[in-house]
Amino acid sequence: MSKNLTTRSEDYSKWYNELVVKADLAENSGVRGCMVIKPYGYAIWEKMQAELDRMFKETGHQNAYFPLFVPKSMFEAEEKNAEGFAKECAVVTHYRLKNDEDRPGKLMVDPNAKLEEELIVRPTSEAIIWSTYKGWVQSYRDLPLLINQWANVVRWEMRTRLFLRTAEFLWQEGHTAHATKDEAIEESEKMMNVYADFAENFMAIPVVKGFKTETERFAGADETYCIEALMQDGKALQAGTSHFLGQNFAKAFDVKFANAEGKQEHVWGTSWGVSTRLMGALIMTHSDDQGLVLPPNLAPIQVVIVPIHKTDEQLAQITAAVNELTAKLRKLKISVKYDDRTTQKPGFKFAEWELKGVPVRIAVGPKDLENGTFEVARRDNLSKEVVAAEKIVDHVNDLLEQIQKDLFDKALTYRNTHITEVNNFEEFKEVLEGKGGFISAHWDGTAATEEKIKDLTKATIRCIPLDAVEEAGTCVFTGEPSSKRVLFAKAY
């Protein structure tokens, strides 16, 4: 097959867009700003879901489901949250259509079917969930309340890109209620760490843990914790957020509990989420000019086996050997695909599975059967080797672990060599437009400076790293005193 992929150095954005479509991950739909996630792309998302869901349950959370629609009066109860999302909301105003008498066979909105109160299509679910929690929480015995929801949300984006920014996207959102401030802060930090663990151990993406500035904070939160990743083009991508909500939503929706002394108090809240944006992060962190590169821990197919034969008799002999190998690999929980299609030649299959990022490819022909060997190819570095049949199972198992580690190490090296300390604004601009990546710089702590830097350079403060050390310095832009460095970058 012909890939005809634009290279990353030619046009990184075009390379990404082409890869998503050609690797059969997703495509644009007939609805502006919305995507169709195709089976192969959805299989990767399912792997992500499965691991995250396990991690949530291991930390005591349960899944539930809440309505897609939120009455406008309920949505606006927490003012900062409503104001923050207002411009992105899709709004339902009518509840039915009718036949259009002036245009036979066509429909129109029935003007007599106007809703008494508009319904907001959820951009996030704090309002509907906290209004429900009011009925669930009465006593300290009902706490903590640890709930997660897998859902779709709608944010009316004008400039969309597959996986990275779409009007409708899939995500999970956790919403928890606690008896004390300390418990809620601990939960917020715990879930940030869960996300970081998932990103590093499953996605093979190193992340910086930190918290957002007040300007970048989630609308309605007292603090937003985040994990930030760096893509191959030197732009950052926010890979997960966890919000300490204080008592803001509890007060807006009057969620109170009787403490051990019988006194009424408002609960403390958190919310946290990751979305199908993670698919974009996965693609952009590891993939190359040949196509997708998937870390084994999230690859729907970890090993593909391609037979090389000229006769049906040869194919039958190869298939017998492959069936034996496949059974042994599957016992080790390794996902295997035997591509015995007779409609395509081996070269086409090699190119197709390379494009789709399958971590390990095994080729076997009549000579391999004679010699008791298999040809094994790695997708990440495109290397090949011949492995004895008696060693193949252990070799493949070890190889998958090695590829997972190597992908993380490669991404970590790139990330670490693209964190640059700067001490003046000229240097800041030079690094931003040249090398790119994270820029570690002093900031005076004001929203005005943050906004001016963004206007002039398009760079935002990605986070204040949790491990940032106290260091006296002067703001890179204003020269005012600063106590620590923050990370700036251009971002998706």
From Swiss-Prot:
Location of the protein in the cell: Cytoplasm
Q: Which residues form the signal peptide?
A: none
In Gene Ontology terms, what is a biological process of this protein? prolyl-tRNA aminoacylation
Reactions the enzyme catalyzes? tRNA(Pro) + L-proline + ATP = L-prolyl-tRNA(Pro) + AMP + diphosphate
Q: Which UniProt keywords apply?
A: Aminoacyl-tRNA synthetase, ATP-binding, Cytoplasm, Ligase, Nucleotide-binding, Protein biosynthesis
**Which Pfam families did the record assign?**
HGTP_anticodon (PF03129), ProRS-C_1 (PF09180), tRNA-synt_2b (PF00587)
Principal location class: cytoplasm
User: Cross-referenced SMART domains, in alphabetical order?
Assistant: ProRS-C_1
- Matching InterPro entries: aa-tRNA-synt_IIb (IPR002314), aa-tRNA-synth_II (IPR006195), aa-tRNA-synth_II/BPL/LPL (IPR045864), Anticodon-bd (IPR004154), Anticodon-bd_dom_sf (IPR036621), Pro-tRNA-ligase_IIa_arc-type (IPR004499), Pro-tRNA_ligase_II_C (IPR016061), Pro-tRNA_synth_II (IPR017449)
State which Enzyme Commission number(s) the record gives. Answer: 6.1.1.15
GO cellular component labels: aminoacyl-tRNA synthetase multienzyme complex; cytoplasm
Q: What class of enzyme is it?
A: ligase
Q: Name one GO molecular function term.
A: proline-tRNA ligase activity
**Description of how the protein assembles with itself and partners:** Homodimer.
Q: What does this protein's UniProt record list under function?
A: Catalyzes the attachment of proline to tRNA(Pro) in a two-step reaction: proline is first activated by ATP to form Pro-AMP and then transferred to the acceptor end of tRNA(Pro).
Domain note: Consists of three domains: the N-terminal catalytic domain, the anticodon-binding domain and the C-terminal extension.
What's this protein's family per the entry?
Belongs to the class-II aminoacyl-tRNA synthetase family. ProS type 3 subfamily.
> What name appears for this protein in its UniProt entry?
Proline--tRNA ligase
Q: Which organism is it from?
A: Flavobacterium johnsoniae (strain ATCC 17061 / DSM 2064 / JCM 8514 / BCRC 14874 / CCUG 350202 / NBRC 14942 / NCIMB 11054 / UW101)
Name the lineage: Bacteria, Pseudomonadati, Bacteroidota, Flavobacteriia, Flavobacteriales
